[in-house]
UniProtKB/Swiss-Prot annotation:
It comes from the Bacteria. Residues 38-106 form the KH type-2 domain. Keywords: Ribonucleoprotein, Ribosomal protein, RNA-binding, rRNA-binding. This is Small ribosomal subunit protein uS3. Part of the 30S ribosomal subunit. Forms a tight complex with proteins S10 and S14. Binds the lower part of the 30S subunit head. Binds mRNA in the 70S ribosome, positioning it for translation. GO terms for cellular component: cytosolic small ribosomal subunit. GO terms for biological process: translation. SUPFAM superfamilies: Prokaryotic type KH domain (KH-domain type II), Ribosomal protein S3 C-terminal domain. Gene3D superfamilies: 3.30.300.20, Ribosomal protein S3, C-terminal domain.
Length: 217
C-alpha cells in the first residue's frame, strides 16, 4: 500500500498538516473550487519563483494565503511591489480580502516539488536524463537527506519505446508513517513528447512529542 499511494496524502493528519485549513457546511464545493482557482492562478503568476506549495486559511470574508517559495525576493518584489500586485489580482479573483504571507524555503534541494521542477526544466533544455537525476541526488544527500529516489519515464533520449529509469540513494521507507517523506511529480515537454518526473525525499523521522500535562514524574 505504501508503495502505491501518494506519500503526502497517506501522512496527512499523522505527521503532515492540511494545506487547506478551513471547513464549511454549505458552501464546501464552491469554496473548494475557489481554492483550486487560487492555486492555479498563483502557479501561473509565479512560474519562475520556485513555489513549493500554498496553504489557504479562511475566516469569514477573509483569505490568508501562505506561499512557500525558494525565491521570496521574486515574489515580494522591490519594496513589496510584486506582492501588492498579486494581492490586488487575488482580491479581484475571489471578491474577498486576501492576505499573503511569504515563507522562504531555506534548503531548496530537500523540497521534492522544487527538485522535480528543476529536473523537468533541465530535461526541456535537452540535458541528459541520467546526469540530472544523479546531480539532484548528490545535492540532496549533501544537504542531509536520509534518502532520495528519482524516476523519469517516457521516451528517454528520443527512444521509440517509452520506459522508466530510476535512481536512488539512502533509504526511503514508504510504509513508515512517522517517516517525513516529501513527494512530487512534474512534467517536461520535450520535442519527443512529455516526460514524467517523480521525486521522493526522506528527511528523517518525525516523532510525536510526549504529553506531560497529566502530571506524573
Amino acid at each position: 500500500m505504501g508503495q502505491k499511494i501518494n506519500p503526502i496524502g497517506l501522512r496527512v493528519g499523522i505527521i503532515r498538516d492540511w494545506e487547506a485549513k478551513w471547513y464549511a457546511e454549505k458552501d464546501f464545493a464552491s469554496l473548494l473550487h475557489e481554492d483550486l482557482k487560487i492555486r492555479k492562478f498563483i502557479d501561473n503568476e509565479l512560474k519562475e519563483a520556485s513555489v513549493s506549495h500554498v496553504e489557504i486559511e479562511r475566516a469569514a470574508n477573509r483569505i490568508n494565503i501562505a506561499i512557500h517559495t525558494g525565491k521570496p525576493g521574486m515574489v515580494i518584489g522591490k519594496g513589496g511591489s510584486e506582492i501588492e500586485k498579486l494581492r490586488n489580482k487575488l482580491n479581484a479573483l475571489t471578491d474577498k480580502k486576501v492576505h499573503i504571507n511569504v515563507i522562504e524555503i531555506k534548503k531548496v534541494d530537500l523540497d521534492a516539488r522544487l527538485v522535480a521542477e528543476n529536473i523537468a526544466r533541465q530535461l526541456e533544455n535537452r540535458a541528459s536524463f541520467r546526469r540530472v537525476q544523479k546531480q539532484a541526488i548528490t545535492r540532496a544527500m549533501k544537504l542531509g537527506a536520509k534518502g532520495i529516489k528519482t524516476q523519469i519515464s517516457g521516451r528517454l533520449g528520443g527512444a521509440d519505446i517509452a520506459r522508466a529509469e530510476q535512481y536512488s540513494e539512502g533509504t526511503v521507507p514508504l510504509h513508515t508513517l512517522r517517516a517525513d517523506i516529501d513527494y512530487a511529480h512534474a512534467e517536461a515537454d520535450t520535442t519527443y513528447g512529455k516526460l514524467g518526473v517523480k521525486v521522493w525525499i526522506y528527511r528523517g523521522e518525525v516523532l510525536p512529542t510526549k504529553n506531560t500535562s497529566g502530571g506524573g514524574k
